Amino acid sequence: MLTLTACSSGGSSTSSTTATPSEADVVAWMDKVCGAVDGTVKAMSDEPSIDMNDPSKLKTGLSDWLGTKVAAVDKSITDLKALENGPHPKSKELVTSAEDGMGQVRTLLADTRSKLDSSTDATQVVTAFTEMIGKAATLEKTGADVQKKFDETGLGAVAQKAPNCKGLQAAPSATPTS
């Protein structure tokens, strides 16, 4: 009788019922997070096709180009939202940081597009676009902040194993540094 009592604790278990995610699950999730961000990075890598000699085509060309960029950022944000409840305890924190960064990029692009669309001459068009380019450092800082969040959330090593994250880290700056 004593043996049976000793073998069965009879008490309630305090162990968590939540399964610990495998590293492979976290890497796969992180790859999706970086893939969502990479969609915007790739969209931002091309230059607008513009005709500097025709003010109406200049305005339309830049506005259309910005419209495709806003759409890419919107897709990234939507894709990120779907990843908020990932397998890592800090999933939501990391994804929210990425969403915030994408939101800043979207605001800059949408505000520039609005200025372009309301401009009445080529000088205003060029000024609005030049202002946006002048804020490119803000965009780069946004990317650096997301990279920093990888480390703060303990996901830096995982990010190095995710193919889409490697692509983000190796992405050269499209902004001239001179």
What label would you give each PLM region?
Residues 3-6:
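C-terminal motif of bacterial Sec signal peptides marking the signal peptidase cleavage site
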Residues 8-11:
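Bacterial signal peptide processing site
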Residues 14-68, 170-174:
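Immediate post-signal-peptide N-terminus of mature secreted/exported proteins
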Residues 31-38, 42, 63-74, 96-110, ...:
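Generic structural signal for well-ordered, non-transmembrane alpha-helical segments
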Residues 75-99, 111-124:
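Short, solvent-exposed, charged loop/turn and helix-capping segments
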Residues 121-127, 173, 177:
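Long, low-complexity or tandemly repetitive, helically biased scaffold regions used
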Residues 160-178:
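Short, low-complexity, Pro/Ser/Thr/Gly-rich segments in the mature regions of secreted, periplasmic
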